């Protein structure tokens, strides 16, 4: 099966490489991990947890041992600003690639527990009610270099609090 998302990322890198070589373009690639924040319309994990909390529905999930590395949107924005400043400083020779991650991976089960603690709720989750997906990533890739001058500062607990505060 062809993964079109991966194919478009590879095509982007090839086109970018062409312009780096022919137009002396300077580039910083930021590889984003799981991002989250208030008003996220993508239907990602935190929106799902919030829906479960307010509806009381039960959700069958995997056993929950896969790890996630969520990065709050404000930290992602700061990474883009740091990358821009690095490009402006003329230290980038051609292309640099950095990982934008919290550096604090957490198991899905533990993330849900953190969410429950932050919301003073208990979600109706049937852990192990469905199998892991084919090719489930159990541990996020962690060998990418961190952008100089940047680190994630918003903890998971603080990020969840900010999401909840934005709903008021």
Over which residues does each language-model region extend?
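Amphipathic terminal alpha-helices
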Residues: 155-168
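C-terminal "lid/loop" region of Rossmann-like NAD(P)-dependent oxidoreductases
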Residues: 94-98, 109-112, 120-141
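Hydrophobic/aromatic residues within transmembrane alpha-helices
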Residues: 144-145
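Residue-level signal for the nucleotide or nucleotide-sugar donor/cofactor binding architecture
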Residues: 3, 40, 44, 68-74, ...
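A recurrent short beta-strand within the Rossmann-like NAD(P)-dependent oxidoreductase core
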Residues: 34-35, 58-61, 68, 80, ...
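Catalytic loop of short-chain dehydrogenase/reductase
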Residues: 1-8, 36
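PAPS/PAP-binding and catalytic site of the sulfotransferase fold
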Residues: 45, 107-119, 159
């Amino acid at each position: 099966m062809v993964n079109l998302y991966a194919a478009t990322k590879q095509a982007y890198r090839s086109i970018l490489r062409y312009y780096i070589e022919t137009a002396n373009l300077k580039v910083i690639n930021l590889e984003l991990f799981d991002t989250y924040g208030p008003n996220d319309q993508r239907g990602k994990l935190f929106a799902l947890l919030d829906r479960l909390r307010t509806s009381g529905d039960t959700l069958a999930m995997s056993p929950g041992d896969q790890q996630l590395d969520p990065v709050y949107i404000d930290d992602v924005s700061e990474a883009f600003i740091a990358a821009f400043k690095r490009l402006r400083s003329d230290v980038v020779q051609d292309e640099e690639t950095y990982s934008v991650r919290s550096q604090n991976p957490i198991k899905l089960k533990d993330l849900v527990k953190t969410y429950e603690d932050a919301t003073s709720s208990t979600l109706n989750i049937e852990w192990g009610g469905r199998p892991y997906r084919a090719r489930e990533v159990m541990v996020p890739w962690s060998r990418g270099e961190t952008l100089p001058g940047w680190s994630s500062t918003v903890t998971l607990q603080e990020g969840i609090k900010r999401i909840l505060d934005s709903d008021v």
